[in-house]
Amino acid sequence: MSLLDAQSEIDVRGRLPRTARMFTGDDFNFVGLIESGSDALLGAFAAFAPNASAAIQALDAGDVDRYRRILGPTEALARQVFAAPTQYYKTGVAFLSWLNGHQSAFSMVGGLHSARSLPHLGEIVRLAREADALEQPELAESRWNALLKVNGL
């Protein structure tokens, strides 16, 4: 479920039988929702999978503070990746994949890599740094600077 309203999702979950599982798809409020009992099924996790994995493992181990420290900063990053127009969120996911060395080029079918502006991508870079979501910071910086240079900046 993705209502993009944390309290509404909690209310719906509260009306379900205990045997039912509700997966949150709320890419804006997932930290509190997962902590409060929603299972996660999030597109945002594709953008920062190592952070998500470490945070969920911490939560499973009962270390709520570590969970919050790891996953908390990723909410702002997810909000930027999924900012309106939301249908272009894949550009942000592909961009982070490229920055992190998982793709050899920042290119998407149909030219969708150009669906987001450089300022939008720059904010993704800033938020990814703050969230410790750049797996290879030096590579990410080099690739970001190369993209800026190609665009005359």
Regions found by a protein language model. Give the residues of each.
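C-terminal alpha-helical cap/extension of soluble enzyme domains
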Residues: 53-153
